[in-house]
């Protein structure tokens, strides 16, 4: 089997769903998996998601995660003050604390916090740029620290292919229906977050993997 590459969007604590999707993919150690951030919050098992990623990395799988805005919010809740903590809790942080059996984010196991603290904001290949949300094309270097907020929070969907070497951008963050995801595969911006944690929304509620070589979508319904 030739080497394959996949990208998976926002997981949001849906550990069982992630593990089932990985099983369906039949991921081999010669494959590469890009994870687009937002591993935690809202769903039932944020701890299980992080444990799955760390275990696979330890076992030698080529897992390449990036940072999402929810990891950023958790870290800000630890580093900053009460306002940041309340904001994170309002965005699903309570579910993360519950999954760890703790009452404060700083009580999350150190290896898991280290994982989140060391996540890059983007990754790239000769064909794709992977980022959680988007890029700010109004600044000289969209990948610089000045573009941090856009990489984590951007929702416009704007892409200027010439500014990224004619490559396609792959992101999560903004939930799309399956039809919208499929239609977007023809564009320069591949948005693959199907809102896994929202199974009640029409056209959403699945965890989606994009096969980067073929453009095929592998869709796993939310099972928790």
What are the residue ranges of the model-derived segments?
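Divalent metal-coordination and catalytic microenvironments
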Residues: 10, 38, 53, 68-69, ...
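Conserved beta-sheet core of the metallophosphoesterase superfamily
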Residues: 147-220
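Active-site-proximal beta-strand elements of phosphoester/diester hydrolases
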Residues: 5-12, 128-134, 190-192
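Active-site neighborhood of divalent metal-dependent phosphoester bond hydrolases
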Residues: 42-124, 151-160
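His/acidic metal-ligating clusters that form di-metal
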Residues: 108-179
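N-terminal active-site segment of His-dependent metallophosphoesterases
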Residues: 1-52
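Active-site environment of divalent metal-dependent phosphoester hydrolases
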Residues: 12-16, 41-44, 72-75, 137-138, ...
